[in-house]
Amino acid sequence: MAKDPGRVLIFDTTLRDGEQSPGASLNLEEKLAIAQQLARLGVDVIEAGFPFASPGDFAAVQKIAENVGGEEGPIICGLSRASKPDIKACANAIAPAPKKRIHTFIATSDIHLEHKLRKSRKEVLDIVPDMVGYAKSFVDDVEFSCEDAARSDLDFLYEVIELAISSGANTINIPDTVGYITPSEFGDLILNINKNVPNINEAVLSVHGHNDLGLAVANFLEAVKNGARQLECTINGIGERAGNAALEELIMALHVRRSYFNPFFGRPPESPTPLTAVRTEEITKSSRLVSNLTGMVVQPNKAIVGANAFAHESGIHQDGVLKNRLTYEIIDAKTVGLSDNKISLGKLSGRSAVRARLEDLGYDLNREDLNDAFARFKDLADRKREITDRDLEAIVSEQVQLPEALFQLKLVQVSCGTSLMPTATVTVVGEDGEEKTAVSLGTGPVDAVVRALDSLTEEPNELIEFSVKSVTEGIDALGEVTIRIRRDGNLFSGHSADTDVVVAAAQAYINALNRLVAAHGRKSIHPQHDLAKVEKKGI
């Protein structure tokens, strides 16, 4: 059997695989904020990015390695393809971290070998020991992944894994790259790897999966029963296509059903020892932070962290819950850090009190960002009687986005009504400090604002998503707007909140435009792109 650390190790890849969600690009400050919250959450490994992809990715991984973790904190990991330039860049980026890991991979399925890598099985068998050994020359902790393992020939897969371990890999990751496998098949795959790889006892078995068939979490739990001891997952399940296995669902499944899973770890069913090191009370905070910074709204019926996860509409259910919550709830909302507490901050609250509460919520702002957030807080306190944690999260999330914005919104005015043509007047400050104003008509106030902004910024794009939701209850609630725009096939998100949803929409659109401008001309490599093609292009 594979190495058993006595519990499940949580490998968070929100900042790498999660960021590959269309429109979920994050800047350095946002990545650092998420990494710091992941450390508070208690994950074992943070995959901070793919350093070779671009200078921006390298800088973000390096910044996280310098500022997050420590001897008692998480391992900081970087991803690299099985090539020396990739591995060297990864090693340099993670070098400042006290605990570091290189995660290198190569495809093992015939379809990937033939159509993507254009390599034979023999060539892969030659590459694996060379590249794992090269990674091992930089760090003691090396993880190796067999990309598309779920569709690979088993005998070839066993041979590759054995070679990787004998070359120094400490962790072997088995990815279901396209979300194809079913739970029983995945369990059998992990079991057969344990049975057929002679040196598997020298490495921890890990799993990575996508949710294309909605089976990622179920697959992982079956893998755990058969010896997998590291789970690669993301906050809110974000990721390419249908997303990755959701961290919060895995953690709470292992928490709530501990008595069921304990025997698979050689424990008595009643053992109270947690199966992971995650602090469950940080789950809701982590979910909201990732949602706010990526602009990816969590669906209301999402397990564990959705707005309706602990809501009861049925009268029968409500009656039962009032009498005893266990009648219809298997999780106490407080276990995941969800509470209805309102913070007692108001017009007379000082900067220190606001800063302390923001730190509790996972935001560690620099002096300039704190001043901006405090100004917005005071403005909101003049318009809203009660300030909740959700309000604070909404108003501060923009402060870590686009600190060097090219466009700044100065003024928005609209006139509209039953017998009026919607008209917007917008003033924007450019990078040179010059103010420009435009007036536009539209089918509605938001359309008019967007048209005015487009005429001022002259950044061609396609608006593909506009959504607005109430942050809290009440007529004075903040309206939270998320906007996605597209150019050249790339998606960019903008997010903002205000008691005036038209103002929020204008700021969200500006934020999306600033992301677009920041990314314009910046080359970035996807880790699953054909290495040979990339090298020919000289990237």
From Swiss-Prot:
Pfam families in UniProt: HCS_D2 (PF22617), HMGL-like (PF00682), LeuA_dimer (PF08502)
Any Gene Ontology CC annotation: cytoplasm
EC number per UniProt: 2.3.3.13
Pathway info: Amino-acid biosynthesis; L-leucine biosynthesis; L-leucine from 3-methyl-2-oxobutanoate: step 1/4
Domain of life where this protein originates: Bacteria
Gene Ontology MF terms: 2-isopropylmalate synthase activity; acetyl-CoA C-acetyltransferase activity; manganese ion binding
Gene Ontology terms: biological process: L-leucine biosynthetic process
Positions of the Pyruvate carboxyltransferase domain: 8-269
This protein's UniProt keywords: Amino-acid biosynthesis, Branched-chain amino acid biosynthesis, Cytoplasm, Leucine biosynthesis, Manganese, Metal-binding, Transferase
Broadest EC class assigned to this enzyme: transferase
Catalytic reaction annotation: 3-methyl-2-oxobutanoate + acetyl-CoA + H2O = (2S)-2-isopropylmalate + CoA + H(+)
Family, as annotated: Belongs to the alpha-IPM synthase/homocitrate synthase family. LeuA type 1 subfamily.
NCBIfam families linked to this entry: leuA_bact, PRK00915.1-3
Quaternary structure, from the entry: Homodimer.
PANTHER family for the chain: 2-ISOPROPYLMALATE SYNTHASE 1, CHLOROPLASTIC-RELATED, HOMOCITRATE SYNTHASE-RELATED
Protein name as it appears in the record: 2-isopropylmalate synthase
Taxonomic lineage: Bacteria, Bacillati, Cyanobacteriota, Cyanophyceae, Synechococcales
